[in-house]
């Protein structure tokens, strides 16, 4: 048992995983599921690139500000549901967040193996 799987600081979230659907024209596309999965995750503030940081400081009434966090589920979540797709959305503290970029897989040792995601709220 590892602190990556247990311990404090996990918070409840709803996960709307990516699903493949076929639109009215017969085209395949991905979108967030309408049915959420209840889960727990840890969150840490993530550093932003210079461009993102400048955009957050622009004087335009706060309409384009953004927050970026690193999110990690217990390893049991990844075993059960796999790695989440790019169209996945997260509901955390009553707000919708989008996955940003690809998942980061850490697999240098079994004790530290985990998957991290970056989430962004626009």
From Swiss-Prot:
This is Gene 20 protein. It comes from Mycobacterium phage D29.
């Amino acid at each position: 048992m590892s602190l990556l799987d247990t311990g404090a600081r996990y918070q409840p979230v709803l996960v709307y995983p990516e699903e493949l659907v076929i639109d009215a024209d017969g085209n395949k596309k991905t979108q967030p599921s309408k049915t959420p999965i209840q889960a727990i995750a840890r969150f840490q503030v993530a550093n932003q690139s210079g461009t993102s940081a400048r955009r957050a400081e622009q004087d335009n009434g706060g309409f384009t500000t953004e927050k970026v966090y690193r999110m990690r589920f217990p390893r049991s979540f990844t075993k059960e549901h796999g790695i989440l797709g790019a169209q996945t959305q997260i509901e955390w503290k009553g707000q919708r967040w989008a996955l940003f970029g690809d998942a980061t897989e850490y697999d240098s040792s079994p004790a530290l193996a985990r998957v991290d995601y970056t989430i962004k709220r626009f």
